[in-house]
Amino acid sequence: MLYYFFKYIDRFSHIPGIGVFKYISFRAASAAILSLCISIFLGKRLIIFFKTAQIKEGIRELDLAGQSEKAHIPTMGGIIIIAATVVPTLLFAKLKNVYIMLLLISIIWMGLIGFIDDYIKVFKRDKKGLAGKFKIVGQVALGVIVGITLIFRDDVVIREFGSNITVIENGQVTINDYKDVKTVKTTIPFLKNNELDYSKLIPWLDSKYMWIVYVLFMIFIIAAVSNGANLTDGLDGLTAGTSAIIGTTLAILAYVSGNVIFSRYLNIMYIPNLAELAIFCTAFVGACVGFLWYNTYPAQIFMGDTGSLAIGSVIAVLAIVIRKELMIPLLCGIFFIETLSVIIQVGYFKYTKYRYGIGKRMFKMAPLHHHFQKLGFHESKIVTRFWIVGIVLAILSLVTLKLR
């Protein structure tokens, strides 16, 4: 909103400093600072309100150290992250940008699904919360929206550079050094010729049906990352801190992929209008860091499914629109290993029960962070070490820009 306001003012006046709103770097920094302030300011007041209203989730007895102390801590803190991300984005971003619209839809939609889940747990006293099938329906709906938008919107393109490229637009023939291409290509990390075209994955499938395969893949990615973030949210500060690290990396990737100079220098896919996403990313990072102010050990508030489902969907959609979704197992390695530990635990238990009649466990408890708790590690040490691993994975993800 402020972008359009100051653009309008600048058209009729020459007030010094107004032109700075044209720069993405300034608006991204402003969004980060504002989101941090909003989350800290709003967090303090919501904690008081939630405690007064007894908005807290029942704690399952898992025989973990310090578990009983968390019974009185309010939940639904994801509202803080969502508000602190959405408000700065509305103020500083170009709201007509298709990528900004997709991310706003994603965080609000999955935040609403998570809110309903938390509401049922808190006010209906049902520890199961929203039935899993309804969460899946929400994730599928978001995947369909994202997939169809990226395929059928005319302004979602990549720009290919060359020399003397003939471009036909509106019946006019021009010679450029680039052309905008409507494609479903993505990036494969660590490979020299690192572009993968989804339309060539199934060569025997008619091209007019390729969008169905693409949408199904988008649904899988969004569901996987969203549930991964949800599983990771088991220790104070773990999901928020990890998400801030991932969000910072995605902000850098969005900016360089949407900047013609950096993209050509790094020889990566250039996506017009994508750099605007850096504003959403920095707002998201600021919101997560501000939430950590109250969520680090010992936590004063939990994000609940309101936060974890929204965070996971945002990270997934960001990776998809930046065309870095195949990097998710590396960049979101913490979410990935937490999810994998649950799959291994359940699968191994079922296998041993079927084979030997007695179910055995691979880990002392899943997800993986609870395994380390059972081994006697303090909660804050586990979280800090997971953050360190997350930082290393983020650096490796950025290294893929040049290492091929």
Swiss-Prot record:
<keyword id="KW-0812">Transmembrane</keyword>
<dbReference type="InterPro" id="IPR018480">
    <property type="entry name" value="PNAcMuramoyl-5peptid_Trfase_CS"/>
</dbReference>
<dbReference type="GO" id="GO:0046872">
    <property type="term" value="F:metal ion binding"/>
</dbReference>
<dbReference type="InterPro" id="IPR000715">
    <property type="entry name" value="Glycosyl_transferase_4"/>
</dbReference>
<keyword id="KW-0997">Cell inner membrane</keyword>
<dbReference type="GO" id="GO:0051301">
    <property type="term" value="P:cell division"/>
</dbReference>
<feature type="transmembrane region" description="Helical">
    <location>
        <begin position="242"/>
        <end position="262"/>
    </location>
</feature>
<keyword id="KW-0808">Transferase</keyword>
<feature type="transmembrane region" description="Helical">
    <location>
        <begin position="132"/>
        <end position="152"/>
    </location>
</feature>
<keyword id="KW-0472">Membrane</keyword>
<dbReference type="GO" id="GO:0071555">
    <property type="term" value="P:cell wall organization"/>
</dbReference>
<feature type="transmembrane region" description="Helical">
    <location>
        <begin position="301"/>
        <end position="321"/>
    </location>
</feature>
<dbReference type="GO" id="GO:0051992">
    <property type="term" value="F:UDP-N-acetylmuramoyl-L-alanyl-D-glutamyl-meso-2,6-diaminopimelyl-D-alanyl-D-alanine:undecaprenyl-phosphate transferase activity"/>
</dbReference>
<comment type="similarity">
    <text>Belongs to the glycosyltransferase 4 family. MraY subfamily.</text>
</comment>
<keyword id="KW-0460">Magnesium</keyword>
<dbReference type="GO" id="GO:0009252">
    <property type="term" value="P:peptidoglycan biosynthetic process"/>
</dbReference>
<keyword id="KW-0132">Cell division</keyword>
<feature type="transmembrane region" description="Helical">
    <location>
        <begin position="209"/>
        <end position="229"/>
    </location>
</feature>
<keyword id="KW-0961">Cell wall biogenesis/degradation</keyword>
<feature type="transmembrane region" description="Helical">
    <location>
        <begin position="100"/>
        <end position="120"/>
    </location>
</feature>
<keyword id="KW-0133">Cell shape</keyword>
<dbReference type="InterPro" id="IPR003524">
    <property type="entry name" value="PNAcMuramoyl-5peptid_Trfase"/>
</dbReference>
<feature type="transmembrane region" description="Helical">
    <location>
        <begin position="274"/>
        <end position="294"/>
    </location>
</feature>
<dbReference type="Pfam" id="PF00953">
    <property type="entry name" value="Glycos_transf_4"/>
</dbReference>
<keyword id="KW-0131">Cell cycle</keyword>
<comment type="pathway">
    <text>Cell wall biogenesis; peptidoglycan biosynthesis.</text>
</comment>
<dbReference type="GO" id="GO:0005886">
    <property type="term" value="C:plasma membrane"/>
</dbReference>
<protein>
    <recommendedName>
        <fullName>Phospho-N-acetylmuramoyl-pentapeptide-transferase</fullName>
        <ecNumber>2.7.8.13</ecNumber>
    </recommendedName>
</protein>
<dbReference type="GO" id="GO:0008963">
    <property type="term" value="F:phospho-N-acetylmuramoyl-pentapeptide-transferase activity"/>
</dbReference>
<feature type="transmembrane region" description="Helical">
    <location>
        <begin position="30"/>
        <end position="50"/>
    </location>
</feature>
<keyword id="KW-0479">Metal-binding</keyword>
<keyword id="KW-1003">Cell membrane</keyword>
<comment type="function">
    <text>Catalyzes the initial step of the lipid cycle reactions in the biosynthesis of the cell wall peptidoglycan: transfers peptidoglycan precursor phospho-MurNAc-pentapeptide from UDP-MurNAc-pentapeptide onto the lipid carrier undecaprenyl phosphate, yielding undecaprenyl-pyrophosphoryl-MurNAc-pentapeptide, known as lipid I.</text>
</comment>
<feature type="transmembrane region" description="Helical">
    <location>
        <begin position="381"/>
        <end position="401"/>
    </location>
</feature>
<feature type="transmembrane region" description="Helical">
    <location>
        <begin position="326"/>
        <end position="346"/>
    </location>
</feature>
<keyword id="KW-1133">Transmembrane helix</keyword>
<keyword id="KW-0573">Peptidoglycan synthesis</keyword>
<dbReference type="GO" id="GO:0008360">
    <property type="term" value="P:regulation of cell shape"/>
</dbReference>
<feature type="transmembrane region" description="Helical">
    <location>
        <begin position="73"/>
        <end position="93"/>
    </location>
</feature>
